[in-house]
């Protein structure tokens, strides 16, 4: 039976400077079946056998392991090609650690009009998909649908000439994956970006479960209109007006079997100790899961 299990996310560390080992121990101690981390963290800790022993000793598995595809869709060609050359070896490490998913992003803006950027992105995604073929690892690309961002984020985009709207919704992400005929490139579905881009439950139901690779869950303030949601002003699931039980239920019915990470960016949980943050994450999910007819375990 398909399950949606919680994984401890780096944003739940409350700014705490936890080591990789401390993070894994925290996940196990607070009842998370999984923990998110990067290959860089794992490699710094030790070889694959040592990392696997740590995970097993704490009763957790990898949720998401970052760092398999080390270039963006619109990175310079040499950088992109070099990154793809390393995919098989890096994916092999992910599998050796017990993982099967990694993350990435899809550009909200492009440096050229969408009609010109689209075929370039399709070609790049086809190559990314082919590079992952046979590795046992899928990548979830996160679209950014939230309408309002920090000034420094906007500056980062504009400084690179990225001023033309590109992919900003689940519908557009599905459209490009259909054109790619993707097998290994999927979606990181964040409830904030889904809701902030006028996403619908129907769109989720139309999404192949095999394409939903990762989940991020959070909520938005009830007194803030959809089109005014700020990416760095999220609140805990259940505190706002997102239809999260329906969201999870629809995702479950696609056949998705994987992990959901709490990602509450902004001041709401700033300064909360990692252990308290981890516990609060599970506490806020329980009533939502119950309403959706799902189990946390």
Model feature map: region roles:
Residues 1-100, 115-116, 122, 126, ...:
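N-terminal pre-domain/capping segments
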Residues 12-14, 39-43, 68-71, 106-110, ...:
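Active-site-proximal loop/turn and secondary-structure-junction residues that shape catalytic pockets
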Residues 12-15, 261-276:
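A short, acidic, flexible beta-alpha connecting loop/helix-capping segment that sits on the rim
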Residues 21-22, 34-35, 65, 127-241, ...:
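Acidic/histidine-rich catalytic cores of soluble enzymes
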Residues 37, 64-65, 95-106, 138-143, ...:
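Short beta-strand segments at enzyme active-site cores
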Residues 68-85, 106-120, 150-158, 227-235, ...:
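Surface-exposed, active-site-proximal loop segments in enzymatic domains
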Residues 211-213, 244, 256-262:
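A short pocket-lining beta-strand/turn micro-motif at the edge of beta-sheets
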Residues 239-253:
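A short, acidic, amphipathic alpha-helical segment used as a generic capping/interface helix at domain edges
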């Amino acid at each position: 039976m398909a399950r949606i299990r919680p994984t401890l996310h780096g944003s739940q560390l409350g700014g705490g400077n936890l080591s990789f080992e401390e993070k894994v121990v925290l996940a196990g101690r607070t009842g998370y079946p999984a923990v998110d981390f990067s290959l860089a963290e794992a490699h710094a800790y030790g070889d694959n056998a040592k990392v696997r022993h740590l995970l097993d000793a704490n009763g957790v598995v990898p949720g998401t392991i970052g760092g398999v595809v080390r270039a963006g869709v619109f990175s310079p060609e040499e950088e992109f090609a070099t990154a793809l050359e390393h995919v098989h070896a890096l994916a092999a490490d992910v599998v050796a650690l017990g993982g099967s998913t990694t993350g990435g992003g899809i550009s909200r803006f492009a440096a050229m009009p969408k009609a010109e950027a689209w075929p370039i992105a399709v070609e790049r995604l086809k190559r990314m998909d082919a590079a992952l073929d046979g590795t046992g690892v899928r990548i979830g690309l996160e679209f950014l649908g939230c309408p309002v961002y920090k000034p420094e984020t906007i500056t980062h985009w504009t400084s690179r000439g990225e001023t033309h709207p590109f992919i900003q919704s689940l519908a557009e992400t599905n459209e490009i994956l259909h054109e790619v005929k993707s097998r290994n490139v999927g979606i990181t579905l964040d409830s904030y970006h889904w809701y902030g881009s006028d996403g619908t439950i129907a769109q989720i139901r139309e999404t192949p479960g095999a394409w939903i690779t990762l989940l991020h869950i959070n909520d938005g303030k009830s007194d803030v209109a959809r089109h005014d949601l700020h990416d760095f002003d999220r609140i805990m699931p259940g505190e706002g007006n997102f239809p999260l039980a329906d969201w999870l239920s629809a995702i479950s019915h696609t056949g998705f079997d994987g992990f959901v990470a709490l990602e509450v960016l902004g001041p709401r949980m700033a300064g909360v100790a990692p252990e308290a943050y981890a516990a609060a994450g599970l506490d806020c999910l329980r009533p939502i899961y119950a309403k959706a007819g799902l189990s946390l375990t």
